[in-house]
């Protein structure tokens, strides 16, 4: 399971011109589910995302996690993160989880984040979405379990 996380000052996701999820200060989490993923991996990745210390403390050092920084999460499914890109000029997606499995694990990941006590907004699984964000820093990390 893969999370591309971006520290943001604002982020929103629109579907057909309608905003379905939005946050101010926090993390935009683009989530990719692979065929070998399971609930245990989803829970571990959630703990890593929620605990990752990439917000500045009073000494301007990356030392606070999203909750300590008073932030929120915007979680958006993105199957393209599971693409194979090593060969050729076209991505392959055989490492991606089947749609039903991916959707179940996506929702499980979101629920785990909510159980961490974080305000968690979402996009819509498998929808054509437009994501708008202001990356703070920019600070972006690729997390994989």
From Swiss-Prot:
InterPro entries in the record: Daa-tRNA_deacyls_DTD (IPR003732), DTD-like_sf (IPR023509)
Role: An aminoacyl-tRNA editing enzyme that deacylates mischarged D-aminoacyl-tRNAs. Also deacylates mischarged glycyl-tRNA(Ala), protecting cells against glycine mischarging by AlaRS. Acts via tRNA-based rather than protein-based catalysis; rejects L-amino acids rather than detecting D-amino acids in the active site. By recycling D-aminoacyl-tRNA to D-amino acids and free tRNA molecules, this enzyme counteracts the toxicity associated with the formation of D-aminoacyl-tRNA entities in vivo and helps enforce protein L-homochirality.
EC number in record: 3.1.1.96
One Pfam family recorded for the sequence: Tyr_Deacylase
UniProt record, GO biological process: D-amino acid catabolic process
Family in the record: Belongs to the DTD family.
Entry's localization field: Cytoplasm
Main location class: cytoplasm
Disulfide cross-links: none
Molecular function (Gene Ontology), one example: tRNA binding
Gene Ontology cellular-component annotations: cytoplasm
CDD domains for this protein: Dtyr_deacylase
Enzyme class: hydrolase
Domain description: A Gly-cisPro motif from one monomer fits into the active site of the other monomer to allow specific chiral rejection of L-amino acids.
Protein name: D-aminoacyl-tRNA deacylase
Reactions performed catalytically: glycyl-tRNA(Ala) + H2O = tRNA(Ala) + glycine + H(+); a D-aminoacyl-tRNA + H2O = a tRNA + a D-alpha-amino acid + H(+)
Sequence motif Gly-cisPro motif, important for rejection of L-amino acids, location on chain: 137-138
Assembly with partners or alone: Homodimer.
Protein keywords: Cytoplasm, Hydrolase, RNA-binding, tRNA-binding
């Amino acid at each position: 399971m893969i999370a591309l996380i971006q520290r943001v000052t604002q982020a929103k996701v629109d579907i057909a011109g309608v905003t379905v999820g939005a946050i101010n200060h926090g993390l935009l989490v683009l989530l990719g589910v692979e065929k070998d993923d399971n609930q245990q991996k989803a829970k571990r990745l959630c703990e890593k995302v929620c605990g990752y210390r990439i917000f500045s403390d009073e000494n301007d050092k990356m030392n606070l996690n999203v909750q300590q920084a008073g932030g929120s999460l915007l979680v958006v499914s993105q199957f393209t993160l599971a693409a194979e890109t090593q060969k050729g000029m076209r991505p392959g997606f055989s490492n991606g989880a089947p749609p039903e499995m991916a959707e179940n694990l996506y929702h499980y990941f979101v629920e785990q984040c909510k159980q961490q006590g974080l305000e968690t907004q979402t996009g819509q699984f498998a929808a054509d979405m437009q994501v708008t964000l202001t990356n703070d820093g920019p600070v972006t990390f690729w997390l994989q379990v």
